[in-house]
UniProtKB/Swiss-Prot annotation:
This is 3-hydroxyacyl-[acyl-carrier-protein] dehydratase FabZ. InterPro entries: FabA_FabZ (IPR013114), FabZ (IPR010084), HotDog_dom_sf (IPR029069). Keywords: Cytoplasm, Lipid A biosynthesis, Lipid biosynthesis, Lipid metabolism, Lyase. Involved in unsaturated fatty acids biosynthesis. Catalyzes the dehydration of short chain beta-hydroxyacyl-ACPs and long chain saturated and unsaturated beta-hydroxyacyl-ACPs. The active site is at 47. GO terms for cellular component: cytoplasm; membrane. GO terms for molecular function: (3R)-hydroxyacyl-[acyl-carrier-protein] dehydratase activity. It comes from Caldanaerobacter subterraneus subsp. tengcongensis (strain DSM 15242 / JCM 11007 / NBRC 100824 / MB4). It catalyses: a (3R)-hydroxyacyl-[ACP] = a (2E)-enoyl-[ACP] + H2O.
Length: 141
């Protein structure tokens, strides 16, 4: 799924759209996305100018956006908005820097009454950069 197709599903736009491409998608079950981290990212201006590191919270947001694509492409949730309801067991294990390609793997554990629970793993190559359990609620836009 190319970026233009992602923009048809997610409401996020630059500089907060953190998924460049979806390379695997099983609607309502799982998705794998890519974020190519460049030195031009606006967050590197302040985090940190002489030692650029992608903020962990933005890695988690990128995972959430991939989860949103997996769910918001399901017919009953098209046109709805995924709102964060919680983040559990979040761990950061590797620094993400300009030039890295972030692989964002998300599996949907459950969808009940509009509450989505998912697990995400962000990797650079084969190294795990971050893991998290995500919860979000599907709401009307």
């Amino acid at each position: 799924m190319e970026n233009k197709d992602i923009r048809k599903i997610l409401p996020h736009r630059y500089p907060f759209l953190l998924v460049d491409r979806i390379i695997e998608l099983e609607e309502g079950k799982r998705a794998v996305g890519i974020k190519n981290v460049t030195s031009n990212e606006p967050f590197f201006q302040g985090h940190f100018p002489d030692n650029p590191i992608m903020p962990g919270v933005l890695i988690v947001e990128a995972l959430a956006q991939v989860a949103g694509i997996a769910v918001m492409n399901v017919e009953e949730f098209k046109g709805k908005l995924g709102l964060f309801a919680g983040i559990d067991k979040c761990r950061f294990k590797k620094v993400v820097r300009p030039g890295d390609q972030l692989i964002l793997e998300v599996s949907i554990d459950s969808i009940r009454m509009g509450l989505v629970k998912a697990k995400g793993v962000a990797k650079v190559g084969e190294e795990i950069a971050a893991t998290a359990e995500l919860m979000f609620v599907m709401a009307e836009e």
